[in-house]
Amino acid sequence: MYTGRFAPSPTGLLHIGSLLTAAASYADARSNGGKWLVRMEDLDPPREMPGAASHILHTLEAFGFEWDGEVAYQSRRYALYEETLCRLQTAGLVYPCHCSRKDWQAAAVHGADGFVYNGRCRNPQQRPALQGKQPAWRIRVPDRDIGFSDGIVGGYAQNLARDIGDFVLLRADGYWAYQLAVVADDAEQGVTHIVRGQDLLVSTPRQIYLQQCLGVPTPQYAHLPLLTNAQGQKWSKQTLAPALDLNRREQLLRQVFRYLKLPEAPETDRPAELLDWAVAHWDMGKVPKHAITTP
């Protein structure tokens, strides 16, 4: 059975880009007779906005979204992440990293998603002294391409050794890394289809590699076009994207429907009816591949 999900982070309030992702993932799930889960990715407390999680859920309800089951909170799932890391440790696929960023980034090269880790701590003889600090944990990556066929973008691949380097699963400050948490959650929740923004396309080969290491199924992925401002920057909390206006729900839904190339919806003042209409007319094949500039 199709199981999709929407996984916002409570570092801020939902904005127009969030609404596009929620609407597309919802329409794809419901049009396939599937479940649609909501998961709160609250992994980084220092960056979270007080009250954002409850505001996000209230906003989704106000826009007519209905999710299946209880909302999952990553902050309550640490035991799952510990078990997942333990499996990788037992298999000898991970190692403790004692490097500070200063230790390795000075001589590092830029890759697909920031600096490429140089593998210094792969060799126990080269690991710097801990000096009472907890290490991070990294996973060894292969020197080969890991690719997949995306439902919107098409074929995409990375050589993890060249483009990413051994990546962190547990940070030295004790916080779980996004890549491990999302793979563990998707597997445990039985997620089969992931519809999300293209800013996460670069993360997908890492997640597929982790799925392979853990022996869990790889979902089908579809990465949506990003909404950008006049300067070409992705609308986000960092670029001061305005929060969704609950007094303009129908107008905003129609706006994201146009971005997703849905036909013009009939007149109604009920957001839930607009979502039902989007489900009935959903066509992933018409979704644009490239970024969309918005007012």
Swiss-Prot record:
GO cellular component terms attached to this protein's record: cytosol
GO molecular-function term, one example from the UniProt record: glutamate-tRNA ligase activity
Motif ('HIGH' region): 8-18
Record text on cofactor binding: Binds 1 zinc ion per subunit.
A Pfam entry, by short name: tRNA-synt_1c
InterPro entries: Glu-Q_tRNA(Asp)_Synthase, Glu/Gln-tRNA-synth, Glu/Gln-tRNA-synth_Ib_cat-dom, GluQ/Sye, Rossmann-like_a/b/a_fold
SUPFAM superfamilies tied to this protein: Nucleotidylyl transferase
Keyword ATP-binding assigned: yes
Family note: Belongs to the class-I aminoacyl-tRNA synthetase family. GluQ subfamily.
The name this protein goes by in its record: Glutamyl-Q tRNA(Asp) synthetase
Source organism per UniProt: Neisseria meningitidis serogroup C / serotype 2a (strain ATCC 700532 / DSM 15464 / FAM18)
Record lineage: Bacteria, Pseudomonadati, Pseudomonadota, Betaproteobacteria, Neisseriales
Gene symbol of the encoding locus: gluQ
